[in-house]
Amino acid sequence: MSKNRFIDENSSELRDANRNPIFGYEDSPVLTLEESVKKLISLVPRVMDYVTTAKKKFNQHSSLLTRDESAAIYLYTISGTSFFESLNKALRTEDRNTLKPWFPFLKLFITALEKLPSVRATVWRGINFDDTLTFVDDEIHIWWSFNSCSEDVSAVKSFLGDSGTLFAIEVIDGKNIAEFSAMPDEKEVVLMPGTRIKRKCESLSIDDRFFILHLEEINSQT
């Protein structure tokens, strides 16, 4: 199965980080998309080709975002690239030397996401094995990577296959990026770095191969 933003391949991708690995990105200036990825050329194959595509195809009709902010979201959602995977892999290292080349893009991308209205909705995300034991009792998990979810469960199930864990997440601060995505039909909602998650109820098992786990986002002030 090809890489997909809605599916994780191991539980560490969700829960390893327990501190803010991007502290200081806020000090970066807001650059153009081209300038924001210059330090990534040696890290992400063909990144400038993807930028060129994003600058041609991004949503140019929004009054919410600048052209470069809109293109940054488009870049993140281009299918078949290693961009989103490389970004989240860097975030999960918690290593500032690894993350610093990403700071300019993070500044542009997060600036764009923060301009979008927050949505309260039930969204869906998957992991391709039984991960129900990760979430126990009232334990709160902090996700420092960007977590892509969908408001359409079928968009996630089509990538998950016949086994794994499907998360139904009640979010309170999700960012609906469908209007700016390269794949608008996926109805994507992004959970921002630092999102706090806990289990809401017991998981549901289907034939001991497929699990549904109900999670909820917790307000950062709770």
Q: Which ranges hold each PLM region?
A:
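Conserved NAD+-utilizing ADP-ribose enzyme module
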Residues: 1-43, 179-222
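Internal glycine-rich, Lys/Arg-flanked active-site/core loops of soluble domains
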Residues: 34-180
